[in-house]
């Protein structure tokens, strides 16, 4: 009886790892032991940075809104507070896009936020 080696599955597994390591430098792209650890590390960084990206974009939207709201005579925090008082439920991404692509529309929204702030004071 012939010994079962599992060579097909092993080759497939190694091939998959080496394919993922394509573009790595030195032994990391061609030797399975180096490639495996490098690919695992790359996947860990990939996972972390996918989570980080969400916060990075939120920070970008807030920075854009701060600039746009100051052009319209409000700080970012007063803009957000005014929008809540006015009952305007636009999220930061939508507001940021509006500030870039439709400044007149953003100015109207900012004025509504201003009026709502003045009404509460």
UniProtKB/Swiss-Prot annotation:
Function: Binds directly to 23S ribosomal RNA and is necessary for the in vitro assembly process of the 50S ribosomal subunit. It is not involved in the protein synthesizing functions of that subunit.
GO cellular component, one term: ribosome
Protein name: Large ribosomal subunit protein bL20
A Pfam family hit: Ribosomal_L20
GO molecular function, one term: structural constituent of ribosome
Keywords for the protein's UniProt record, in alphabetical order: Ribonucleoprotein, Ribosomal protein, RNA-binding, rRNA-binding
A biological process term (GO) from this entry: ribosomal large subunit assembly
Recorded family membership: Belongs to the bacterial ribosomal protein bL20 family.
């Amino acid at each position: 009886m012939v010994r079962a080696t599992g060579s097909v599955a092993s080759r497939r597994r190694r091939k998959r790892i080496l394919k993922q390591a394509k573009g790595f430098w030195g032994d990391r792209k061609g030797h399975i032991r180096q490639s495996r650890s490098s690919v695992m590390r790359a996947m860990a960084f990939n996972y972390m940075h996918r989570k980080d990206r969400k916060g990075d974009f939120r920070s970008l939207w807030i920075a854009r809104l701060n600039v746009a709201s100051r052009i319209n005579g409000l700080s970012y925090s007063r803009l957000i507070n005014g929008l809540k008082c006015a009952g305007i439920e636009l999220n930061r991404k939508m507001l940021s896009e509006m500030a870039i692509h439709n400044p007149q529309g953003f100015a109207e929204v900012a004025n509504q936020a201003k009026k709502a702030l003045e009404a509460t004071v």
